[in-house]
Amino acid sequence: MAQTLSFNGRRRVRKFFGKIPEVAEMPNLIEVQKASYDQFLMVEEPKGGRPDEGLQAVFKSVFPITDFSGASMLEFVSYEFEPPKFDVDECRQRDLTYAAPLKVTLRLIVFDIDEDTGAKSIKDIKEQSVYMGDMPLMTNNGTFIVNGTERVIVSQMHRSPGVFFDHDKGKSHSSGKLLFAARVIPYRGSWLDIEFDAKDIVYARIDRRRKIPVTSLLMALGMDGEEILDTFYTKSLYKRDGEGWRIPFKPETLKGAKAITEMVDADTGEVVVEAGKKLTPRLLRQLSDKGLKALKAGDDDLYGNYLAEDIVNYSTGEIYLEAGDEIDEKTLGIILSNGFDEIPVLGIDHINVGAYIRNTLSADKNENRQDALFDIYRVMRPGEPPTMESAEAMFNSLFFDAERYDLSAVGRVKMNMRLDLTVEDTVRILRKDDILAVVKMLVELRDGKGEIDDIDNLGNRRVRSVGELMENQYRLGLLRMERAIKERMSSIEIDTVMPQDLINAKPAAAAVREFFGSSQLSQFMDQVNPLSEITHKRRLSALGPGGLTRERAGFEVRDVHPTHYGRICPIETPEGPNIGLINSLATFARVNKYGFIESPYRRIVDGKVTNDVLYLSAMEEAKYYVAQANAEMNPDGSFVDEFVVCRHAGEVMLAPRDSMNLMDVSPKQVVSVAAALIPFLENDDANRALMGSNMQRQAVPLLRAEAPFVGTGMEPVVARDSGAAIGARRGGVVDQVDATRIVIRATEDLEAGKSGVDIYRLQKFQRSNQNTCVNQRPLVTVGDVVNRGDILADGPSTDLGDLALGRNALVAFMPWNGYNYEDSILLSERIVADDVFTSIHIEEFEVMARDTKLGPEEITRDIPNVSEEALKNLDEAGIVYIGAEVQPGDILVGKITPKGESPMTPEEKLLRAIFGEKASDVRDTSMRMPPGTYGTIVEVRVFNRHGVEKDERAMAIEREEIERLAKDRDDEQAILDRNVYGRLIDMLRGQVSIAGPKGFKKGTELSNAVVSEYPRSQWWMFAVEDEKVQSELEALRGQYDESKSRLEQRFMDKVEKVQRGDEMPPGVMKMVKVFVAVKRKIQPGDKMAGRHGNKGVVSRIVPVEDMPFLEDGTHVDVVLNPLGVPSRMNVGQILETHLGWACAGMGRQIGELIEAYKANGNIEPLRKTIGDVVGAGPKAEQVHEFDDDSVLRLADQWKRGVSIATPVFDGANEGDVNDMLRLAGLKDTGQSTLYDGRTGEQFDRQVTVGYIYMLKLNHLVDDKIHARSIGPYSLVTQQPLGGKAQFGGQRFGEMEVWALEAYGAAYTLQEMLTVKSDDVAGRTKVYEAIVRGDDTFEAGIPESFNVLVKEMRSLGLSVELENTKLDEAQANQLPDAAE
């Protein structure tokens, strides 16, 4: 492979410090979303051959629908999607939802029913395709466009369906006794709980209703008492032997017991065990070997046992005793007196087997199935009298009806695993055997056998992704629709109807709209930068419908669990009330078809690690020994150490190397994408790493992105998968490039009917959801050869295809005059002057002209009482120009609204009749810039309702758009022509012609020169002798014409869309959107951070000359507080500083060598230095083989600082950092001598100086600072509103009142509480006084006092205010405050 092609300076080359080879390919980072939704819609699948899942399964589960009489039936045949009306960009611009119309083919069958026999025969069948609303489509980046905004559907973690065994941890009962419980959770349907109470009776609950004895549930399943006992207990037969009894010897029940009396062999009569002796397993084995079959027992040994069967007189049928009765003197007497000499006894010994089910049976008041069914009916439907039919139907519908109850495939699989069953996963209802198995398992748990489940284990929690959430929602919509269809089928003349007439698709469409618009899991996409987009799509939430709530979630659910390893990131989760409930998927994790998260492992065969990769879920992994990715290995793949650190069943342990089955794929498979972007993560404290990964998501895209010197190797992956950087869809040659688009002539995947041209439109200064700027810049030049996947253009926060969230800054760790107290950050003025941390933010303003009752509003330049100066930025249509600089209060769009008519005098009426309308009946409602915003207009869009005349501005925008479309069409046409005519001339060359254009001599041999004499359009007239070539010519012609017409058609469609009116909300005639771009330089009060959770606020920006400087005169850019490191324990930032310093040092050397090369033309020293930096290793070989051009390109890339990658948990260690420093010719302490910029004196001690990657976070002081003089007031309390968004005031709270009281500032305080807040009359008076230039005013009663009085009155307390003047005598009687 020629390295010259692969490197053309378009991607960043990094020195790689990782030592562990990457075996598995990292899955696409947004696969979770895309795969799930594709599986739901199955757009690509052929109509007939769709499997029963997703949308197909939903339709199959609701249809067929029969009417109440059974005379007609509506069947589902298939569904298909029509192409969406608007593409993604059009939907964004017009505030529409990106969706495709769903057409469902339904079949209506009408039956003839014979009145006498009831036999059905088909009378009529009608099929029709019915429109069922629009189904939102996912964009290529895994998002949805809903009403013009990008949204993400977050995956939900919930408890997997199946059966769970648990106990109450001793909390329910004062004795601290463990009460065990089992719960069967279906995917949908009633929950079944089976639980013990404090008296060891087993109860069942359905849907958490009143509890009933579990034996009633078993009777309702058709069992009687004897059968129940037979199912749960073994039987022993006690036989009468002379005066005593012969009891069978069962060693397994006697283990560990003590012989109270001596044990006698019933056959030989000898004593086999002395009294008081312990029965050890060895002793019992010896007795069995000796052939001991039965023991001798007296009557008193039988007491306390229970009968296993009814004792019945078979001749009369009289029942003496029932199964389960306890044997005592009385019952034994009855048995013996009736001549029974054999007693069947239950195998209950109260040690290994408890009498719980027997006790429950005896406590149960229900005797038979009918009583049990009635009891269950009364619990489920209290107040309704039960009949046998209704009770039976209700009980069956609870667990045994596939319509109402669905365990789902997952539930069945989990149930099989837990209960050791082997049932097909298509059996989605409960069976009698399932319930019995659950009760058996629960009783065994109570007897001390088996383990309870851990509900936080990822084997018991599963992920519901978009597709599944959508499926459930759509099912709800269809079920609502089903009721309406049934009613309509019964009430309508069925013979004359088509399926279309029965269907009202509104409920289904509404369910979809409701889900995307207002579900808790449908979220406004976090679009600050590419990383925040990707993280949002990979998020797992335990909240949402059917999930947990913040308040009820305890510590256990939020905690990190051993099964999270390689599946869920232990670091990245929000701080605050949602901690641990919202998680992020680990880098290599994927979700399997059952919704469980899987992680990849390498197989170990015969003690050697292979490159065979296996994905396992938490349940499957438990039985293996898994070695860590960094375990030391020999070249042949065997382990170096005898004992290897590994994970097994949730524990980390040392185990012999022979017992290893699997090995981790990569050290970064533990963490999420954001955490994997932090270099030296292994040296940071986890709390700070959490902050670091969360803050990277808030980094604002800067004006000039710059990739970090010290990266981790994850950067290109994020840039590519997020869709921020544009990758080539297929290989080809770059044909045209400008700032807005790239045209590539494809050289691969050239199928017939597929365009041979790829046009990539770049987004220019678009607004993101968070008002940051999305802008893409081309990296390629005309004539470049590109391969599939090559990066063609950088997006926001990307640099040469690498994620670039911030900038490399020269940092010194030292105190500086107290300006870095409490994590504050001191910056140099150079950073402001060079726009290092400058970002662009785009705000959108929209104005609508509505049709009001008094007449239509109008967008116009003609505004009453506004000076010409204020209109200077508006065009003749009243809309601001693109490129205008605007400030607070400037008019963006002029708009007038009709005012209410005032009654006119006859004179006015006369004047109006003579001179026409007058201008004073409108008021100015123009849109103006809000306070505190300055910027430049970058885009204006005008939307008109159908049939409303377009203004000049709208026409101009439309013309521009059509020109742009025409240019696209012409370019594509030109490339098509060039390709086709090129192929045509190749075919004709050397052929003998038999026909040609007018005036052409037949029989001539064709050559380039001959053909070129004629215009291109006439080339098709040539015909040749060779029939094979002639047929190829005709095929080419057909293909060309088809491509041409397809292109023209596409162009016409788009033009038609541009020209036709827009769909508007009701009552809106016209809408204008104005986009204002604001350039924000960094300033004091802005928040900045590094990647290690080291955040701070800019405290001061100092002139460059005052900043500390190095010996070569370089001033540092940033001064950080050294005290921010030790207590926070994020040492990673120090290692990053040193390594960054070494990178810059190497870059300086390379820069000097480039200059030397320019002077003497010798490239070898440069090649050698680059080779030394890269070193050896798997990723280094290609760099050593670069040609001279590539070396120069790479040197140019590296001259500011060498790019390196230090992957998490496998990166550079202290030795590597020292080596790099030495290579760069720097001291290996990493410290430098600094001089004070103000005095020029040297600082006493050496200072750590180096490069740190700093981010500017989306917490800008401009968005927060805010002032109000007058503004809106709250309706009830009349106090000013709060917050910047409401233009509110500052709250003067309780503590501030204390401060003024402490100063004794009584008048100031009174003002604060009255006229400056909610004394309505007082504040107007103050205003009037100030206007008069007078400063006397009086404070009245605050409105909040009136509210208080009203509230007390509403409680029935008569509070009256007495308004009396006190005379002097009364005043003197008042208690003196001073006393």
From Swiss-Prot:
<dbReference type="Pfam" id="PF10385">
    <property type="entry name" value="RNA_pol_Rpb2_45"/>
</dbReference>
<dbReference type="InterPro" id="IPR042107">
    <property type="entry name" value="DNA-dir_RNA_pol_bsu_ext_1_sf"/>
</dbReference>
<dbReference type="InterPro" id="IPR007120">
    <property type="entry name" value="DNA-dir_RNAP_su2_dom"/>
</dbReference>
<dbReference type="GO" id="GO:0006351">
    <property type="term" value="P:DNA-templated transcription"/>
</dbReference>
<comment type="subunit">
    <text>The RNAP catalytic core consists of 2 alpha, 1 beta, 1 beta' and 1 omega subunit. When a sigma factor is associated with the core the holoenzyme is formed, which can initiate transcription.</text>
</comment>
<dbReference type="InterPro" id="IPR037034">
    <property type="entry name" value="RNA_pol_Rpb2_2_sf"/>
</dbReference>
<comment type="similarity">
    <text>Belongs to the RNA polymerase beta chain family.</text>
</comment>
<keyword id="KW-0804">Transcription</keyword>
<dbReference type="InterPro" id="IPR014724">
    <property type="entry name" value="RNA_pol_RPB2_OB-fold"/>
</dbReference>
<dbReference type="InterPro" id="IPR007121">
    <property type="entry name" value="RNA_pol_bsu_CS"/>
</dbReference>
<dbReference type="InterPro" id="IPR019462">
    <property type="entry name" value="DNA-dir_RNA_pol_bsu_external_1"/>
</dbReference>
<dbReference type="GO" id="GO:0003677">
    <property type="term" value="F:DNA binding"/>
</dbReference>
<dbReference type="InterPro" id="IPR007641">
    <property type="entry name" value="RNA_pol_Rpb2_7"/>
</dbReference>
<dbReference type="Pfam" id="PF04563">
    <property type="entry name" value="RNA_pol_Rpb2_1"/>
</dbReference>
<dbReference type="InterPro" id="IPR007644">
    <property type="entry name" value="RNA_pol_bsu_protrusion"/>
</dbReference>
<dbReference type="Pfam" id="PF04565">
    <property type="entry name" value="RNA_pol_Rpb2_3"/>
</dbReference>
<dbReference type="InterPro" id="IPR015712">
    <property type="entry name" value="DNA-dir_RNA_pol_su2"/>
</dbReference>
<dbReference type="InterPro" id="IPR010243">
    <property type="entry name" value="RNA_pol_bsu_bac"/>
</dbReference>
<dbReference type="InterPro" id="IPR007642">
    <property type="entry name" value="RNA_pol_Rpb2_2"/>
</dbReference>
<keyword id="KW-0240">DNA-directed RNA polymerase</keyword>
<dbReference type="Pfam" id="PF04561">
    <property type="entry name" value="RNA_pol_Rpb2_2"/>
</dbReference>
<dbReference type="GO" id="GO:0032549">
    <property type="term" value="F:ribonucleoside binding"/>
</dbReference>
<comment type="function">
    <text>DNA-dependent RNA polymerase catalyzes the transcription of DNA into RNA using the four ribonucleoside triphosphates as substrates.</text>
</comment>
<keyword id="KW-0548">Nucleotidyltransferase</keyword>
<dbReference type="GO" id="GO:0000428">
    <property type="term" value="C:DNA-directed RNA polymerase complex"/>
</dbReference>
<dbReference type="Pfam" id="PF04560">
    <property type="entry name" value="RNA_pol_Rpb2_7"/>
</dbReference>
<dbReference type="InterPro" id="IPR037033">
    <property type="entry name" value="DNA-dir_RNAP_su2_hyb_sf"/>
</dbReference>
<protein>
    <recommendedName>
        <fullName>DNA-directed RNA polymerase subunit beta</fullName>
        <ecNumber>2.7.7.6</ecNumber>
    </recommendedName>
</protein>
<dbReference type="GO" id="GO:0003899">
    <property type="term" value="F:DNA-directed RNA polymerase activity"/>
</dbReference>
<dbReference type="InterPro" id="IPR007645">
    <property type="entry name" value="RNA_pol_Rpb2_3"/>
</dbReference>
<dbReference type="Pfam" id="PF00562">
    <property type="entry name" value="RNA_pol_Rpb2_6"/>
</dbReference>
<keyword id="KW-0808">Transferase</keyword>
